[in-house]
Regions:
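A short, flexible N-terminal coil/short beta segment enriched in small residues
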Residues: 1-15
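Glycine-rich phosphate- or other oxyanion-binding loops that anchor nucleotides, phosphorylated ligands
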Residues: 11-200
């Protein structure tokens, strides 16, 4: 179920959409003043949350969270800023990427890649990653394309942090824990850039 949280602080320009509780925990304090909406995981919950989010205040809308890399050029903890998000139907929505990348780099975060993020309705493993990568996408998630309508004409950005890669898929609990901690820390470090992007 979706849940709205308000972070402390004065800047209230950003509506931040995050699928999971752990992602919200990473970003809540990192983006003071943002309205944080936990959307739930997967397309059905994301689509329902987008309807709710479209009615919430915020001059800018961003999606933050984890993703799977589609290429081994990326590694766990790397930041992916979407140039566009693509649904499983191939439809794409352009994102505000350059100002966000600049804000990240101003904060010393250099492991940042920009490119398409594709959203699907299932966990992607094995050869399917290569198929999606062949279409030019850098990363995969299960929500961003369904959350995009929430922007409703407002600036829209997607910031995802790599959880696993084709060569380092997380299928065991210990591997998931290690990768999760790495991704969580990177997401927390990236959070202030989202606030700067929204305030620009």
């Amino acid at each position: 179920m979706s849940e709205v949280e308000r972070a402390g602080g004065a800047a209230k320009r950003l509506l931040l959409l995050v699928p999971m509780v752990v992602e919200a925990a990473a970003l809540r304090r990192a983006v003071p003043g943002a309205t944080v909406l936990r959307t739930g995981v997967g397309p059905a919950r994301a689509a329902a949350a987008a309807v709710k989010a479209s009615r919430l205040a915020g001059a800018a809308v961003a999606v933050g969270g984890f993703c799977g890399a589609l290429t081994d050029d990326l590694r766990p903890g790397d930041i992916v800023v979407a140039s566009e998000v693509r649904g499983s139907d191939g439809h794409g929505v352009r994102c505000s990427s350059e100002p966000l990348v600049a804000a990240l780099r101003e904060r010393g975060l250099q492991r940042v890649s920009v490119g398409p993020v594709v959203s699907v309705d299932h966990v992607v493993r094995g050869a399917e990653r290569a198929i999606l990568a062949a279409g030019g996408a850098l990363a995969v998630d299960m929500e961003s394309a369904w959350l995009a309508p929430a922007a409703a004409g407002r600036p829209f950005a997607v910031l995802r942090v790599v959880l696993d890669t084709p060569a380092r898929e997380v299928t065991r609990p210990l591997a998931m824990l290690i990768a999760g901690v790495t991704a969580w820390r990177a997401l927390r470090r990236a959070g202030p850039a989202l606030g700067a992007w929204a305030a620009a």
